[in-house]
Amino acid sequence: MKGEYNVTLNTKNNVIKYTISISRQITIVCGKSGIGKTLLHDMVAEYCKMEGRGAVEISSGSDKVSIEPFDGSVALLREVENGKKFKDGTTKLKWLEKPSQKIFIIDEDLIITKGINFADAIRYTDAYYIIFTRDLRLHKYMYNSVWDIITLEDVGIVGIDNRAVRAYNEFNGYVKGYSEVIHEDYATGREICELALCEKIKTSYGNLNLVSHIKKNYKNTSILVIADGANFSNIMERLKKVSKRKQLLIYLILPESTEYVLLHNAIFSESRNVSEYLLDPVSKYNTENWITYEKMYEQVIIEESSKIDEINNYEKVEGLETYKTESFIDTYRAILTRIDGIKSSYNVKYSLYKIENGKLMVGDLHSSKINELDKENEK
């Protein structure tokens, strides 16, 4: 499965309308309990049952892709492997029929989705999954693949229906002071980041350990966190909780991945393959080949670095020295330019968030959500 789709669901009288943009295998839809999620899932179920003749209209923007509810019992077979169960009490899952060019809608009440075996089962399948949940730690998804269902009453407008908006609004300011830097990567990313910042930084040894590392080591201070955004999963919500409990101000810099940043270096500029992946990653990413964009960029840099004599074949631990040149350090500085005094000759996309007292600080949060809704309504 590849490509970007604007999944639009609405009642034919336009009283209820949702539009969600998806371009990765997993998209998360969250929100307060009872607001919209179950209603949206029921809208899809009605559409499929009535074969488009009911009160619900649905479109993916492509006649090659079908959208349908996922109920688990139809698509997957539960079976015991050697009579044993997994630690979470569930059994191995096996596809009865591999999906092809499908977008599945999955409700959080479906118990089958909560085990690690379900996460394994949907990997490398020719399908996208829109999952309605408030906590899904076992799956890998990007921070901007999370959508929130809100009522416009939440932003001060009364009497208008629900809408789906991206859950996390970026911080539009600058990093102003921090006591310490934590990088989730223990090898390449951290070492190059140290050279770019000219200071020693800590590591959490991976995204999975990031929250526990911060919870254990910091309180009543401000910190700067740098992590791969491609598989950030539910860490944003957990950081908000830690920020409130530990009285932390957390600046969070999220590039797609370290490999994504390094591929912007001039040494790869002659590679048409690299240019295509950086300029139009949506058309290159295929769920049957990679779980996340991070894995895609890692494969690209390994393949392309093997063709260049001036640098070693890219490995996260070995052969790192050739990536410690001023040119690569300058490339990495491109994601640090919101820190006072740091400049770069490169331009690399990344996101900056500021979490304080458990909340994302973005200026006027309500106005930003209203602006997004206005843009959607203009379509």
Report the location of each language-model feature.
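Post-Walker A alpha-helix
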Residues: 40-41
